[in-house]
């Protein structure tokens, strides 16, 4: 029999972070092919590298008293693991699921199990692209979506997460 570890209330309840003097950690997840940003289809995704976008996100988090953890993977299971592990250590998740947006029910289930704010992020606007990109299996389980703002989306998504954490705290 597998026994689930009980979660600490300070870690699972974003409002308890401030009361316990803990700096909230925000998880930024980058899905498949995002490691190629700056090289792959720059006319759609821009010329900024993933490192530059993560730097922008980290600056927003730190300016608001939070830390930022970043995970990038081209493998669905690794991303699901990162989201599950965030349940014990992060107050919010910002995720650019890439192509997993459209078919990863495993990722959607992992996100649904996370109690804090969850922001779906896309550099381009999937609704303005090919028909197969217009479906998000992640959207029903996240707090909100930031899409189509290019590099500004990373800052906007982090600002949304920070704002939601402040409202919960």
Regions found by a protein language model. Give the residues of each.
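Extreme N-terminal starter segment of soluble prokaryotic enzymes
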Residues: 23-26
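Glycine- and acidic-residue-enriched helix-capping/strand-helix junction motifs
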Residues: 37-51
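Short beta->alpha junction loops
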Residues: 67-77
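Short Gly/Thr/Asp-enriched flexible loops that form oxyanion-binding sites at enzyme active sites
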Residues: 85, 104-116
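Short acidic/histidine-rich motifs immediately flanking catalytic phosphotransfer sites
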Residues: 86-93
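Short, acidic/small-residue loops that bind anionic groups at enzyme active sites
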Residues: 112-129
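Short, glycine-/small-residue-rich phosphate/pyrophosphate-handling segment
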Residues: 128-169
